[in-house]
Amino acid sequence: MQVRGSDDTLEFADKFRNYSKEDGHAYKKMNNKKFVLRRKSKLYCPNCKTKNNLNSIYCKECGTLLEDISKRTYDFSISNILSNISLKDSFKVAGFATLILFAISIVLKLILRVSLGNYVSYISTFDLLLLINGGNLNILTNANSMMNYGNYYNFAFQICSLALLVLPVICMVVSYNIFMKQKNTDELTLVRQAIGVGVIYGIILTVLALVSRNSLSIGGGYLSSGYSLVYGVSFLSVLVRGILLGFLSILYIGTKKEYIQNNMYLGIFKQVVNTVFLGYFIVFVLLVLGYFIGLSYVYEFGISGSISNINIFVVISQLAAYIWGFANLNPVTIGNQNLFLTNIFSTSLSIDFKLCLIAFIALSALILLISGIKLNNKYKTHAKKTTLIFSGFYAILMGVLAVFTCVNVNGGSLLGYNVQMNMSIIFTLIISFIYSFIVTFIGFKLNNWD
């Protein structure tokens, strides 16, 4: 029988030591947030049934331990979430983000004065702030003259630019880091923060939309024409988009690494956001390169007259969203072109750009396949459950993208033309869910093959 020496014994003991004998730090890191001490019974000892104080750890009669270590669980019921939302902190974050955006709107108004001159005085700072958040501008005009009295014309301008939406997101990030980041202690708290900030931000924008409606009279006099204008941003449009902006921004930036490890839903949500952003960014870069090498796709959609005074990068950033939507097999309207997989070769687009669109479809399939492989690496089992959750989040995010990228200029009978660039929200939700589920599920299963 071999007897261990003293050195061997110490080396053997060090392998199973929990704490360092030099400075006392723990060798094995345990995630204590996964566990919590809970009372076995609120008042009575489980052993002798003696009534104890709520603060007691041991039974006063028999000494039985009244607490037990159990896995931490969260109550994500709607009533529990809504009843514990901190309205004060939510208002701080949403209000300060609005103040930052108001200052940015003042700067933008000064920049617009260079190109628009005195006409910029008709645009209030609040209007700019609401338009940055994707608000719809409605204009009602009444034309009066000696020969023509009381003719009403209605204009609707719905222009949501992704390039401008970056500004409120940045303001939300800054405000959140100042007022709320330190209080983000667990997944349930994060969901409450996101809902609270989203709702308060939407309400603030709604109030601004209701108080910022303007009226304007132009011209008039004997034998001359006069126009009266009533214009303002639709409160319903900024309410919906404000809630979505606040909720999604806080939920994404507040998701920590440990939340991704502990909560499958938050982990998949963050992966979906990264997947959509990656696809959009690649399409944007490729469209920019295509523009500089001479592809005339911007003019093939019949919108060149409407965008002649807009920076080309802003236009491409908008087109990239529609092309990414088409790459996910969604029907898309861009100017005079209605794009869908079945009619792509019957459109008037050049053959080069048609082939590019087919390549974008292949790109989206590749990205979703890789996402399926990543899901398999993180969650080895429950293929259908994880891919269903992924596809649900993916469809919702694509639907949100459709909401924030809608462009609809309705000139009415006075101007006589309309400009539309959008994705159908309903079709986008349905098709994106089915398409992403099929491709992601294939990627999940492919990773199981040896």
What are these regions (language model features)?
Residues S79-I106, T185-V199, Y265-F284, K380-G392:
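Alpha-helical transmembrane segments and their helix-start/interface "positive-inside/aromatic belt" motifs
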Residues N84-A97, Y152-N184, R241-Q261, L355-K380, ...:
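Transmembrane alpha-helical segments in integral membrane proteins
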Residues M1-R72:
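Cys/His-rich metal-coordination motifs, chiefly Zn-binding "fingers/knuckles"
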